[in-house]
């Protein structure tokens, strides 16, 4: 009997393929390490629409609310492009985030030494890179009211509202400082306090939270435009970057390209603690459903595997096991194993999705 519950939502496109490799790793932890999980599986996105006419059923939503963690593969694809907006596959993902109130989006950007030459930047700038961007996910300009397009006089006007409350900023700040304590004890908060009132409030609240509870963590502030420049100029100066929804959306994609491949990038979205002390949580690879390679065995499963490693660390407090899994991934890459997305100009023979999963399991067992 285990007290660790996990809901798997493979989704669409390459989602089921990469999730199958995570299943191998879950099975290995159970058989080799005695660390078992109560795993259930359900449909989301286009797969749920095909079966039920909606991208996420109420029953699946209820299940997601009750487990310790949700692990999602990918949603969407061209087959669903003409659906009504309300039932598009992506609406299932957005409903999960909204109803679980997953306000802290964690986007790591880590460059394994074996892949440093795949970055668009010089090896010496990115080799050894390991930063974490915490993006506030449920407020800000994407959600603020009023919003919309209307007519004033003879022209159309588009309006979006950047709005943050103290509570929304403070809970994101707490998450960032707690995260830094697990890492290298540094937080850089990014906003535009020089031109935006929401940025002024953001900086004030972050300072207040820091002064009250996290004096041991080094805090700095940076305007977000300078932050984007610094991510490209000298990314290794950062540990944890804390920022709002809009800037986080932009900065995390910028940081993603420092690492060489979207197929390598995991993410976590965390909410408030549940009764058992574990945060509500959903983990997913950053990459999409990749319909162009679906069913061909070409997908890179590493982002999904590293998303499970994040679940081990942040939902199940199994940091040593997360490090073991991340080390296995790094070791496989150091040995030269590459899926198609990681093939360099010198060519070579890529391995399949399944072969990559098998290689990582073999390293875990070594």
Curated annotation (Swiss-Prot):
Assembly and interaction partners: Homodimer.
Name of the coding gene: leuB
Marked site positions, Important for catalysis: 142, 192
Protein name: 3-isopropylmalate dehydrogenase
Documented EC number(s): 1.1.1.85
Enzyme class: oxidoreductase
BP-aspect Gene Ontology terms: L-leucine biosynthetic process
Keywords assigned by UniProt, alphabetized: Amino-acid biosynthesis, Branched-chain amino acid biosynthesis, Cytoplasm, Leucine biosynthesis, Magnesium, Manganese, Metal-binding, NAD, Oxidoreductase
Function in brief: Catalyzes the oxidation of 3-carboxy-2-hydroxy-4-methylpentanoate (3-isopropylmalate) to 3-carboxy-4-methyl-2-oxopentanoate. The product decarboxylates to 4-methyl-2 oxopentanoate.
Localization per Swiss-Prot or TrEMBL: Cytoplasm
Reaction equation(s) it catalyzes: (2R,3S)-3-isopropylmalate + NAD(+) = 4-methyl-2-oxopentanoate + CO2 + NADH
Pathway listed: Amino-acid biosynthesis; L-leucine biosynthesis; L-leucine from 3-methyl-2-oxobutanoate: step 3/4
Binding site for substrate: 97, 107, 135, 225
SMART domains referenced in this protein's UniProt entry, alphabetically: Iso_dh (SM01329)
UniProt-annotated binding residues for NAD(+): 77-90, 288-300
Domain of life: Bacteria
Disulfide bonds: none
Keyword Metal-binding: yes
Sites where the protein binds Mg(2+): 225, 249, 253
InterPro entries, per database record: IsoCit/isopropylmalate_DH_CS, IsoPropMal-DH-like_dom, Isopropylmalate_DH
PANTHER family: 3-ISOPROPYLMALATE DEHYDROGENASE
Family: Belongs to the isocitrate and isopropylmalate dehydrogenases family. LeuB type 1 subfamily.
Cofactor(s) needed by this chain: Mg(2+); Mn(2+)
Record organism: Jannaschia sp. (strain CCS1)
One GO MF term: NAD binding
Pfam assignment, any one: Iso_dh
Cellular-component GO terms for this entry: cytosol
Cofactor note: Binds 1 Mg(2+) or Mn(2+) ion per subunit.
């Amino acid at each position: 009997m285990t007290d660790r519950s996990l809901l798997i939502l493979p989704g669409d496109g390459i989602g089921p393929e990469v999730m199958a490799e995570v299943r191998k790793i879950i099975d290995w932890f159970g058989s080799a390490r005695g660390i078992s999980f109560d795993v259930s599986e359900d449909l989301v996105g286009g797969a749920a629409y095909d079966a039920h006419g909606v991208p996420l059923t109420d029953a699946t939503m209820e299940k997601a609310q009750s487990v310790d963690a949700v692990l999602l593969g990918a949603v969407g694809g061209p087959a669903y492009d003409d659906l009504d907006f309300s039932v598009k596959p992506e609406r299932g993902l957005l409903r999960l985030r909204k109803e679980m109130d997953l306000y802290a989006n964690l986007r790591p950007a880590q460059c394994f030494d074996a892949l440093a030459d795949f970055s668009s930047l010089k090896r010496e700038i990115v080799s050894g890179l390991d930063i974490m961007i915490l993006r506030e996910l449920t407020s800000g300009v994407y959600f603020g009211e009023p919003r919309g397009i209307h007519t004033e006089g003879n022209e159309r006007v588009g309006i979006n509202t950047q709005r943050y409350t103290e509570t929304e900023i403070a809970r994101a700040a707490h998450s960032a400082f707690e995260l830094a304590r697990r890492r290298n004890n540094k937080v850089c908060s990014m906003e535009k306090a020089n031109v935006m009132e929401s940025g002024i409030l953001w900086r004030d609240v972050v300072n207040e939270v820091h002064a009250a509870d996290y004096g041991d963590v080094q805090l700095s502030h940076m305007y977000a435009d300078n932050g984007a420049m610094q991510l490209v100029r000298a990314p290794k100066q950062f540990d944890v970057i804390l920022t709002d929804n809009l800037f986080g959306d932009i900065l995390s994609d910028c940081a993603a390209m420092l690492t060489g491949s979207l197929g390598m990038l995991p993410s976590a979205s965390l909410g408030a603690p549940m009764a058992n002390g574990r945060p509500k949580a959903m983990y997913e690879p950053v990459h999409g459903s990749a319909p162009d390679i679906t069913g061909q065995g070409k997908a890179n499963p590493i982002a999904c595997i590293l998303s499970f490693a994040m679940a081990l660390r942040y939902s199940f407090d199994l940091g040593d096991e997360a490090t073991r899994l991340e080390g296995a991934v790094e070791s496989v890459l150091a040995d030269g194993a590459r899926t198609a997305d990681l093939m360099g100009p010198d060519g070579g023979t890529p391995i399949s999705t399944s072969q990559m999963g098998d290689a990582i399991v073999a390293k875990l067992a070594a």
